[in-house]
Amino acid sequence: MANASQLSPTNKHFFKPLLPGFQRNLNIPVKFFSEHIEGKHEGETVKLRADASKRTWEVKMDGNRLTEGWKEFVEAHDLRIRDFVVFRHEGDMVFHVTALGPSCCEIQYPQSISHEEGEESGEVEISEREVEENLQKEYDQSSADLNCFSQSVTHSNISNDLVTLPRDFAKRNGLDKGMHEIVLMNEEGKSWESEVRSRMSGQVFIVGGWKSLCSENKLKGGDSCTFKLLQNAKTPVFQLCSRIGESRFVKLTPTLNSLEIGKQHLPVSFTKGNGLIHPGEIILVDKDRVEWSMKLQVDNRGGMHIFGGNDWKSFCAANEVGAGESLTLELIRGGLSPLFKFFSKIEQPSFEAEDRRHKRARVHNGSQETDKGEPSRATKMGPELEKREKTAEKGEPSRASNKSSGKQGNLQKTQACSVTDHVAKVKESVVDTLTSIRRFQAELETMEQKLEDSLQEINKLS
């Protein structure tokens, strides 16, 4: 945690939970802005500092909103939705920023070191997030090629030019002890010299060449990629063989059953191609940029599916997607907490509309067959039907007319019922959405109270 002196009462501070859309800009609380900034400082730029590096970031301030330059600060510090940031005002429009993860613990960043310093000490610090992601990747390698491994790309591992290597993979290929020279190679054959190093804790990582490979192949934070080890050379070669961008879109068609039980299966080719092979949290963002938290689960056959209960149904309703209609999701971020964004709705008739269309087609085809010359029932019945028709002419309604009017009445009832059902479904979706929003607000309030309590405890220590 940040030390008590940094958060003492003499240093005014505020905290902000990071919600969807925070990457573009961030609002300074109105009360803090009016009491400590507005009218007290000239200029429209603030300076941000953090423990992650010695760099000072200049960010433009539009009113009480941080705008130009904020996105670069976010990317450099790998800030994500559900993180919290504490701004400590050090005076003269300078803020020290402390980042906290969803667990309210301070995020530990790697030290800014050079490769030469790393060689002398034999150790390189990496962020806790990368350690967690590395451990998660080691859970299941059985279904994949033993000479392959998947890796998440982050802004942090790009800027530090180093990336963790799954320990099982390193051990299996004799790369888990000491230092080994390797070559990183893309699919076109372009290569970069690099090294694999280990430390006392058992951690293994690739040092050097990573930043250049990502730049050359347009890999950026949030992407995932797969490497294959080529052992037919004196120096091990890690060849890039796939990336998330090649198959980041997936088409899903919810059924009545999947909407009711709140579960949607994902294509095996999509999940394996993007490294989505571990259960955990998953985030879906709808067309209005509202975030939905659900689960990524594994079924008995090893397939992956989204499970959200009523939230899955509400998510589809929010995007105006019904049973039998298709939607396309775009995978924005892989890793431990995959992020999907609604991309488009594929227009097609629902099951009920399709069924009605087939019924109309059958009726139409039947009339066409009669027109072509096939004898109708009326023709086959002959004199008996003529007798009934004469009776109808005298005033008694025929069964045919009764049946026709009966069908019209039933049709009107069906239409009325369909409208009622539709209204009920819309109402249910709205209620589900409101429930989700209220639950999220309650979680934020709880988190806010915890942070306030922590700050009070820190103030007491000072």
UniProtKB/Swiss-Prot annotation:
The keyword Cell division does not apply. Residues 351-419 are annotated as: Disordered. It comes from the Eukaryota. It holds the Pfam family B3. One of its GO terms (cellular component) is nucleus. Residues 399-418 have a biased composition (Polar residues). InterPro entries: B3_DNA-bd, DNA-bd_pseudobarrel_sf, REM_fam. Coiled coil: none annotated. Residues 369-397 have a biased composition (Basic and acidic residues). Keywords: DNA-binding, Nucleus, Repeat, Transcription, Transcription regulation. This is B3 domain-containing protein REM8.
